[in-house]
Every structure is written in structure tokens, then in C-alpha cells.
């Protein structure tokens, strides 16, 4: 009984990222396409004052643009959406793999080696430079500057 409750609790706590629900209403929750892809008729076609087409032409042009953009996007996403999602998933999996298994270990190795070198560098500074600059400080500590105005 206790084991079943523990397993049930673990099942509720651990959520697999592959099973998470997606929002079919807000498909851009992080607003990554806020200003980039939003292109409406008014963003592309505009008639300056004094150079207007017939009202009917303007209305039909608006409808044609909007409907053709809508259905062309739907057709392209139907034909290419899944293959491109597969391609992008593969690409980002490769990038993640390289980052996890190559980049981070290289950086960690570099930091370990640099730490060893930094100890040697610090020792050299304390051994050679600190006494030199302390002596120069003593020599220059008795310098007095007097400013006089002439004239």
C-alpha cells in the first residue's frame, strides 16, 4: 500500500517533457515572432493620399492578399511543417549533444589548467614584482612636488 502511494506520488512529480500539453490558442507564448513575421496588408501595400485606386479594387486586393497568405501558409505548413520540425529537432539535438559532451568538458578542462597556471603566475608576481614595486614605492615616497606661479 505504501509502495503504491510512493510510486503514484513520483509519477505525479516527475513530468516528462514529451508529454506536456501544448496551447493551441496561443502558439507563440514567448513572443519570438512579435515584430518579425506579423505582416498584414497595411504593412505591405499602402496608397498615398491623392493616388487611390477604386474602393472595390482596394477591398478585393485586401481580401486576396489576406486569404492567399492564409491558405499559402497553411499549405506550406502542411507539406513542410513536419519534415522541417524533424530537421530542426535533429539540428538542435546535435547542438545540445555537442554542447553537453564537447564544449562544456573543454571549458572545464581549460579552467582547471588555467587555475594551475594562475597559481604559478601568482607566485611569480609575489616573488619578483611585489618586491620591485615595493622598492620603487619607497624610492618615490620622498619625492615632493612644489608648484610655483611665475609672473
Curated annotation (Swiss-Prot):
Gene Ontology BP, a term: regulation of transforming growth factor beta receptor signaling pathway
GO molecular function, one term: connexin binding
Presence of keyword NADP: no
Cytoplasmic topological domain residue ranges: 1-83, 105-151
Matches recorded under InterPro entries: Caveolin, Caveolin_CS
Primary location recorded for the protein, binned into one broad class: Golgi
Keywords annotated in UniProt: Cell membrane, Golgi apparatus, Isopeptide bond, Membrane, Ubl conjugation
Cross-link type Glycyl lysine isopeptide (Lys-Gly) (interchain with G-Cter in SUMO3), residue numbers: 38
Intramembrane region positions: 84-104
Summary of the tissues where the protein is detected: Expressed predominantly in muscle.
Pfam assignment, any one: Caveolin
Keyword Membrane: yes
Domain of life, per lineage: Eukaryota
Compartment(s) where it occurs, according to its Swiss-Prot or TrEMBL record: Golgi apparatus membrane; Cell membrane; Membrane, Caveola; Cell membrane, Sarcolemma
Membrane topology: Peripheral membrane protein
PTM comment text: Sumoylation with SUMO3 by PIAS4 may reduce agonist-induced internalization and desensitization of adrenergic receptor ABRD2.
Region: Required for interaction with DAG1, residue numbers: 64-114
GO cellular component: a single term: caveola
Family according to the record: Belongs to the caveolin family.
Function text: May act as a scaffolding protein within caveolar membranes. Interacts directly with G-protein alpha subunits and can functionally regulate their activity. May also regulate voltage-gated potassium channels. Plays a role in the sarcolemma repair mechanism of both skeletal muscle and cardiomyocytes that permits rapid resealing of membranes disrupted by mechanical stress. Mediates the recruitment of CAVIN2 and CAVIN3 proteins to the caveolae.
Subunit structure: Homooligomer. Interacts with DYSF. Interacts with DLG1 and KCNA5; forms a ternary complex. Interacts with DAG1 (via its C-terminal); the interaction prevents binding of DAG1 with DMD. Interacts with TRIM72. Interacts with MUSK; may regulate MUSK signaling. Interacts with POPDC1. Interacts with CAVIN1, CAVIN2 and CAVIN4.
Name of the molecule in the record: Caveolin-3
Organism: Mus musculus
Designated gene of the protein: Cav3
Amino acid at each position: 500500500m505504501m509502495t503504491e502511494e510512493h510510486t503514484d506520488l513520483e509519477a505525479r512529480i516527475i513530468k516528462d517533457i514529451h508529454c506536456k500539453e501544448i496551447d493551441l490558442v496561443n502558439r507563440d507564448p514567448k513572443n519570438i515572432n512579435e515584430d518579425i513575421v506579423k505582416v498584414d496588408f497595411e504593412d505591405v501595400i499602402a496608397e498615398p493620399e491623392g493616388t487611390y485606386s477604386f474602393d472595390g479594387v482596394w477591398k478585393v486586393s485586401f481580401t486576396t492578399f489576406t486569404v492567399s497568405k492564409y491558405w499559402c501558409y497553411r499549405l506550406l505548413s502542411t507539406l513542410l511543417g513536419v519534415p522541417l520540425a524533424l530537421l530542426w529537432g535533429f539540428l538542435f539535438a546535435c547542438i545540445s549533444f555537442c554542447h553537453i559532451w564537447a564544449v562544456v568538458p573543454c571549458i572545464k578542462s581549460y579552467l582547471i589548467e588555467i587555475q594551475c597556471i594562475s597559481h604559478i603566475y601568482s607566485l611569480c608576481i609575489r616573488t619578483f614584482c611585489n618586491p620591485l614595486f615595493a622598492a620603487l614605492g619607497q624610492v618615490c615616497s620622498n619625492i615632493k612636488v612644489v608648484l610655483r606661479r611665475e609672473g
